[in-house]
């Protein structure tokens, strides 16, 4: 029985559960549920605070977990990233009062408020910078206005909250974060990991690709296939109409409309695009 930790709340929770459902796993219907047994797939899900997930996995209490890359690195737990999951993307940035024109080198001796002391301390130590870290549990944006800190380091998605509090970003991002699948860094990988990983990878591919079908004359077939090479090769079948072929290929979702325009210009017709519900590659 595979034991997997899932965020119980926050920005990662709903997206994680949605991905797991798309991968064929049962998920809780009541947010008060803390444990759910999916007997069909042989998985037991535990809904935990996102910040605690890396600790449970690192200690070997649970086999796998879904959490943020920022929280994994901040925890210093004995856990490693298996694969990125494509949601919950954010950047970890430094910010100061608007107009302060600070640089990274000027952080020496300053008060720096953050909810991620482990992550920030490691980043600064690698660069020989010694700031006074002040750990806060959320609402870091108000620390400068309240006189608690000179600068902050926090997760930034749009930057709207920072601007509303009179702050501006400076320096390069400390980290590009997103939701990740993790397992313990020591010992043998848990049984069932590869199947679970393949299912999630199938969801990612299904989200990022579509299936494209079209008919094209033999004279334009090579050019059309160059536009739709697929993962290995497009599927090409002769039609009853002499000189015409049917083509099927996976194409990147974001490029589908542009590819359709080019195919039409080549003379392709009956161009259809359908979603991919699931796949294994």
Where are these regions (language model features)?
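Small-molecule-sensing regulatory modules
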Residues: 1-42, 47, 67-80, 85-91, ...
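Short, structured active-site "lid" loops
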Residues: 42-61
């Amino acid at each position: 029985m595979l034991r997997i930790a899932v965020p119980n709340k926050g920005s990662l929770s709903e997206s994680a559960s949605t991905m797991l459902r798309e991968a064929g796993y049962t998920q809780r219907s009541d947010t008060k549920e803390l444990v759910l047994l999916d007997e069909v797939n042989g998985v037991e899900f535990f809904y935990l605070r996102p910040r605690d997930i890396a600790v449970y996995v690192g200690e070997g209490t649970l086999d796998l977990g879904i959490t943020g890359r920022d929280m994994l690195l901040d925890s210093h737990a004995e856990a490693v990233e298996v694969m990125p999951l494509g949601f919950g993307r954010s950047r970890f940035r430094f910010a100061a009062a608007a107009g302060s024109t600070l640089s990274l080198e000027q952080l020496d001796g300053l008060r720096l408020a953050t909810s991620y002391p482990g992550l920030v301390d490691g980043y600064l130590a690698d660069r020989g910078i010694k700031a006074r870290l002040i750990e806060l549990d959320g609402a870091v944006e108000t620390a400068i206005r309240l006189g608690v800190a000179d600068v902050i380091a926090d997760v930034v998605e749009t930057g709207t909250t920072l601007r509303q509090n009179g702050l501006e970003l400076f320096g390069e991002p400390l980290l590009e974060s997103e939701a990740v699948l993790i397992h313990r860094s020591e010992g043998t990988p848990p049984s069932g990991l590869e199947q679970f990983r393949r299912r999630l990878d199938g969801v990612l591919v299904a989200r990022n690709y579509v299936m494209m079908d079209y008919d094209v004359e033999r004279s334009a077939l090579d050019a059309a296939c160059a536009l739709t090479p697929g993962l290995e090769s497009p599927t090409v079948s002769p039609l009853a109409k002499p000189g015409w072929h049917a083509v099927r290929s996976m194409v990147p979702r974001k490029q589908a409309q542009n590819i359709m325009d080019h195919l039409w210009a080549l003379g392709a017709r009956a161009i259809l695009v359908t979603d991919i519900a699931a796949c294994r590659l």
